[in-house]
Structures are given as structure tokens and as C-alpha cells.
């Protein structure tokens, strides 16, 4: 009898214990799917901003300013960028020239032209017809940076390299985007071999919409970076950007194979820069 009572008591206690146990927590809901805008890739046919470089002399100050200095520019570059001494317009063409010249601790001079405050754009088509220099140690570029660094210093606020070329790899043109998720050697990019890259003019183009960024040479697409819809770490390209034209000397990439002084002066020639508004 006592044994049966004890078994019964244990049964009651077990039931009470089970009935009082909290239910296991529900699994967390799945993350929402990425939100990627569905938009057109249409652009106006007339430029909203352009420079045809049809007036000889200094570059148009209503369109361009200069970044000046010789601090390596975050890439251990060797040149000192001057205030228009290395950039002139002649015969319908802009000439940005890197040359051997001692300025401060730098042994080279060049120019770095920017449109900031004179041309800042959110989305659009950017078209530049240019001929780039070759030779070991040259590093010409056509690129865009965030006008306000809204998300923080590089690479958080983004960079779009419409054209980059390093002289030790003469026929190879690069298009790359950098952001907090992908930057430096891990930037999202593509390259295209152009046999006449340093001998002839080519049209370098970037199409930029809320859905993505595309890169072209002479009308042929060779790069695309789609907006992943995961936030500003991978898509800081929802703010105005400005354009940069420059010819660097040496640096982490441009100088990876050294600098050949026999190639200087080295000039990037620009026939025109045209910006077209994106049509939503």
C-alpha cells in the first residue's frame, strides 16, 4: 500500500512538473528577402553636364578644381599634384601630363582634376573619350567618389573606377567598385584586353542606376555590379558622387613593377566628358 501510494505521488509530481514547464521558444523568423529596385536603364540623350574642351588654356574653372599635394594619396604614389601646371587644354583636347620634376620630396609632378562642387551626380551615364599613357609606373584613372562621405571614410562611402590602367600591363583596362564589403584587392571588378589601349582614343562609360552599375568600353559592356539590396555596406551608391581625372606615378599598384623614367612626360588626353541624367 505504501509502495503504491509512493508511486502515485511520484506520478502526480511528474505531471505537475511537466505541466509547469515553459514552452520552447519559437524559431526566429527568416530574414526578409533583399530589396532590389526594379528600374529602367534609360538615360536622357542630351548631356546635363559636359566639357568638350574646346577653349584653349587652363581647364574650365566652372567645371573643374584641382586637388594639390604629394602625400601619397593613400596608395604610396610618388607624384606631387599641382594646381593646373600639369593640365592644359589645346586643340579641343585636355592634356594631363605627369613629368619628372622635383617638388618638395616628390620627384614627379602631375594633375588630379575633380568636379566636386561643380558636378555632383546621383545616378546617370558617364561617358569619357580618352587616350591613356603607357610605360612602367604610370597609373591613369577616371573615377567617381562620394561627394559627402556620408557613410564614413574610404571605402565605406564607395568608389567607382570607370577606367584604371597600370603601365606595366599595357593592354589591360579595369573597371572596379569599392565599398565596405568589397574593397582594395577584393573590390568587385572586371578587366578587358584592348590591343590599342595606349595608342588610340576609346570611350569609357559607366551606367549607374539604383539597380546597379555597368561598365563599357566603346559601347561594349564588360562589367556589372548589381545592387544586392543588403544595405549600405555593399551599396553606398545612393548618394551623389563627383568625378576625378588623374595620372598617378608609382604607388602600390602602379609602381608594383617599378618606374621607368624614360616614359616621361606621360600624358592622358581627354576629348570630352559627358554626363547624362538617368530616366526613372
Residue ranges and their predicted role:
Residues 2, 13-44:
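Bacterial Sec-dependent N-terminal signal peptides
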Residues 10-14, 79:
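Compositionally biased amphipathic helical and low-complexity segments enriched in hydrophobic
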Residues 32-280:
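GH16 jelly-roll
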Amino acid at each position: 500500500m505504501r509502495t503504491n501510494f509512493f508511486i502515485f505521488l511520484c506520478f502526480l509530481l511528474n505531471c505537475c512538473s511537466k505541466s509547469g514547464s515553459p514552452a520552447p521558444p519559437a524559431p526566429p523568423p527568416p530574414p526578409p528577402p533583399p530589396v532590389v529596385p526594379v528600374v529602367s536603364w534609360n538615360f536622357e540623350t542630351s548631356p546635363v553636364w559636359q566639357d568638350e574642351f574646346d577653349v584653349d588654356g587652363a581647364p574650365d574653372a566652372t567645371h573643374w578644381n584641382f586637388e594639390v599635394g604629394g602625400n601619397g594619396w593613400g596608395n604610396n604614389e610618388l607624384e606631387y599634384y599641382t594646381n593646373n601646371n600639369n593640365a592644359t587644354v589645346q586643340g579641343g583636347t585636355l592634356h594631363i601630363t605627369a613629368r619628372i620634376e622635383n617638388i618638395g620630396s616628390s620627384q614627379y609632378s602631375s594633375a588630379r582634376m575633380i568636379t566636386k562642387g561643380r558636378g555632383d551626380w546621383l545616378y546617370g551615364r558617364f561617358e569619357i573619350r580618352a587616350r591613356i599613357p603607357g610605360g612602367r609606373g604610370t597609373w591613369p584613372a577616371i573615377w567617381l567618389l562620394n561627394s559627402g562621405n556620408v557613410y564614413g571614410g574610404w571605402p565605406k562611402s564607395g568608389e567607382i573606377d570607370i577606367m584604371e590602367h597600370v603601365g606595366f600591363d599595357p593592354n589591360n583596362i579595369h573597371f572596379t567598385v569599392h565599398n565596405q564589403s568589397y574593397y582594395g584587392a577584393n573590390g568587385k571588378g572586371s578587366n578587358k584586353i584592348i590591343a590599342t589601349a595606349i595608342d588610340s582614343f576609346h570611350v569609357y562609360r559607366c551606367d549607374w542606376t539604383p539597380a546597379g552599375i555597368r561598365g563599357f568600353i566603346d559601347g561594349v559592356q564588360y562589367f556589372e555590379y548589381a545592387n544586392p539590396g543588403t544595405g549600405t555596406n555593399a551599396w553606398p551608391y545612393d548618394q551623389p558622387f563627383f568625378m576625378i581625372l588623374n595620372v598617378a606615378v608609382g604607388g602600390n599598384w602602379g609602381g608594383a613593377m617599378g618606374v621607368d623614367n624614360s616614359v616621361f612626360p606621360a600624358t592622358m588626353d581627354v576629348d570630352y566628358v559627358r554626363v547624362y541624367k538617368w530616366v526613372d
